[in-house]
């Protein structure tokens, strides 16, 4: 994301409370200002699911019902379609109605290209051992409410077997991060559910305004150890990582991807992003 794009986003959101953010995202979509869109699915997520299937709920020809996945802040839905290719029934959620409209059009374009034999869409084909792509649904609404669940014909008690967060947490103001952690804990299936986070922008100092707001390994550890609690900082400004409490999440794996989006690379082409895999304590 260029400095110009970061400056426009930060000037739009940085000094505004979370409650005022709602109308601003649809306005940016209506302007067709979407610097967070990567033009395709996460290479890091694709490679992880192929290489480490033991770390996520499996999907095979005998899996019934299919596990459910959620992508909050899904934008045009590239990662939603990717997870469907791995066999998950996926809900793509975004606050902006225009995002849902573009996601629907993107899905239509991908399916048409597949029928025409376009090899560039092979990433969205069912993976080996997966009988067919999972069902895809698009929802519009506030991640922190239950209205989008009802819109997707799901009960408010619904939990998900896999949740993928990329450029969602970093879009929220720092004050909303404990609320994000609590909501993720509530939405994750306690029986084997996995939260997969692609850390971006990794290492950006928290003193620099966002969005995107900076993230570190310790930020996730502190937030998810005690969902809903505000992390504390040490005298040197580093984040204190507390012990995990009941209802918290533990990190199962921290992966340095071999590939990621260009936005997650250093100037020399090395990968800056990290990929985290989490489960609820006891899961």
Language model segments and positions:
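A conserved beta-strand element that flanks and buttresses the S-adenosyl-L-methionine
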Residues: 164
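Class I (Rossmann-like) S-adenosyl-L-methionine-dependent methyltransferase catalytic domain
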Residues: 2-70, 76-158, 174-283
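Short catalytic micro-motifs in class I SAM-dependent methyltransferases
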Residues: 167-171
